[in-house]
């Protein structure tokens, strides 16, 4: 690119390390020389059972009975979905906003809070998008590492807030990629600090715990949720957040008007109408998580961390990072995809999403060969 053009672009973005997303399934299949149906995806914490039958039926009904809906812009206020979410989470629609996945809502919160030079606390190892998005807005990121068991260092966070004037903290509950639950008492202590606390509950349905009931009574609390994991709608990009009315007005001002597409809203509403089926699927995944964890823990040289999510973090107690990478690569050659993170504190770990029983058995068969 000519220097005259690059001079018009932000130099801080040129220096930014790009986020590494999951490679598309078809690309991976071609790279591995395997048919798509042979690939077992245990790398992105997706729902192995897919969307609910009612969601699929609702999408088919739109295509068959009202295809014109795809030709007109969607409801900018997400009226039907927010009403359904209000019934689901017990918060009024006025405290709920929807987005194209919780990723968009993370971005909106940072856009509303952070100016260049402002400070955000990050608690690694955690979801990398928090620090990535903060860097996009020119924020200074103060890292307060988690404990050996991946709990939040509350005193360290409080010190960073007092010392650096931090304005914002994102915490995944349960944490990704460790699966660590976040105690309600920890959240309540952090809410006493002069910061906006955003709790990312992407895996809340698997954990069975939430602090969304505190929204409204604690003005500095934001709770984010997604339909990607428990509802099996990752490909449609639909999430939501609940927060105090004084805060949510800022997000309504800056969000794109038609940010949630018609198909996503239809499928999300139908998923909430099919709640018993969805929660039954969640229960199956949780039960399979425990079975898989026990089987992995029985393998030599692997420590499995307790998880409240739909994935398991496993540390190599022998062989370190080289062994973790080798296991990932060996599994990939067999068409089984897991996640490896080249990050401090977890570079000798692999993360395994909980699949169907037969998928997990295929994983275990290979691990028994190479462990």
UniProtKB/Swiss-Prot annotation:
What SUPFAM superfamilies does this protein map onto? PLP-dependent transferases
Q: Name one GO biological process term.
A: L-histidine biosynthetic process
Q: Which Pfam families match?
A: Aminotran_1_2 (PF00155)
Which pathway does this polypeptide act in? Amino-acid biosynthesis; L-histidine biosynthesis; L-histidine from 5-phospho-alpha-D-ribose 1-diphosphate: step 7/9
Q: What would you give as a GO molecular function for this chain, any one?
A: histidinol-phosphate transaminase activity
Task: Give its E.C. classification number.
Answer: 2.6.1.9
Q: Tell me its cofactors.
A: pyridoxal 5'-phosphate
Mind telling me which Gene3D superfamilies this protein's record contains?
Aspartate Aminotransferase, domain 1, Type I PLP-dependent aspartate aminotransferase-like (Major domain)
Q: Which InterPro entries match?
A: Aminotransferase_I/II_large, HisP_aminotrans, PyrdxlP-dep_Trfase, PyrdxlP-dep_Trfase_major, PyrdxlP-dep_Trfase_small
List of residues that carry N6-(pyridoxal phosphate)lysine: 229
- Catalytic activity, reaction form: L-histidinol phosphate + 2-oxoglutarate = 3-(imidazol-4-yl)-2-oxopropyl phosphate + L-glutamate
Q: Which UniProt keywords apply?
A: Amino-acid biosynthesis, Aminotransferase, Histidine biosynthesis, Pyridoxal phosphate, Transferase
Q: Which CDD domains match?
A: AAT_like
HAMAP family linked: HisC_aminotrans_2
Q: Matching PANTHER family, A to Z?
A: HISTIDINOL-PHOSPHATE AMINOTRANSFERASE (PTHR42885:SF2), HISTIDINOL-PHOSPHATE AMINOTRANSFERASE-RELATED (PTHR42885)
Q: How does it assemble?
A: Homodimer.
NCBIfam families named among the record's database cross-references: hisC
> What family is reported?
Belongs to the class-II pyridoxal-phosphate-dependent aminotransferase family. Histidinol-phosphate aminotransferase subfamily.
Protein name per UniProt: Histidinol-phosphate aminotransferase
State the organism of origin.
Roseiflexus castenholzii (strain DSM 13941 / HLO8)
């Amino acid at each position: 690119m000519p220097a005259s053009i690059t001079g018009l672009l932000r130099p801080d973005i040129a220096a930014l390390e790009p986020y590494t997303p999951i490679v598309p399934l078809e690309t991976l299949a071609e790279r591995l020389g395997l048919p798509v149906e042979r690939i077992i995806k245990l790398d992105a914490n997706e729902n192995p059972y897919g969307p609910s039958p009612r969601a699929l039926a609702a999408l088919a009904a739109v295509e068959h009975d009202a295809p014109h809906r795809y030709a007109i812009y969607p409801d900018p206020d997400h009226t039907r979905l927010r009403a359904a979410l209000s019934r689901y989470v017990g918060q009024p629609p006025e405290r709920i906003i929807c987005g194209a996945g919780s990723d968009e809502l993370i971005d909106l919160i940072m856009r509303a809070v952070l100016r260049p030079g402002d400070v955000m606390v990050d608690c690694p190892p955690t979801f990398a998008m928090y620090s990535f998005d903060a860097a996009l807005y020119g924020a200074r990121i103060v890292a307060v590492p988690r404990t050996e068991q991946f709990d939040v260092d509350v005193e360290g966070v409080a010190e960073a807030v007092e010392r650096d004037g931090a304005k914002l903290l994102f915490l995944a509950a349960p944490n990704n990629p460790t699966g660590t639950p976040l105690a309600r008492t920890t959240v309540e202590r952090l809410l006493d600090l002069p910061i906006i606390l955003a709790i990312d509950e992407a895996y809340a349905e698997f954990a069975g715990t939430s602090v969304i009931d505190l929204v409204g009574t604690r003005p500095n609390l934001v709770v984010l949720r997604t339909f990607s994991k428990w509802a099996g709608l990752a490909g449609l990009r639909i999430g939501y957040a609940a927060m105090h009315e004084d805060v949510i007005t800022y997000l309504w001002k800056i969000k794109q008007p038609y940010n949630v597409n018609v198909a996503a809203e239809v499928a999300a509403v139908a998923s909430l109408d099919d709640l018993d089926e969805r929660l039954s699927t969640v229960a199956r995944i949780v039960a399979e998580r425990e079975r898989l964890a026990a089987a992995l823990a029985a393998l030599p040289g692997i420590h499995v961390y307790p998880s409240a999510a739909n994935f398991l973090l496993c540390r190599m107690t022998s062989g370190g990072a080289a062994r973790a990478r080798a296991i990932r690569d060996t599994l990939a050659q067999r068409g089984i995809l897991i996640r490896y993170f080249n990050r401090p504190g977890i570079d000798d770990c692999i993360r395994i999403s909980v699949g169907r029983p037969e998928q997990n058995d295929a994983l275990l068969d290979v691990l028994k060969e190479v462990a």
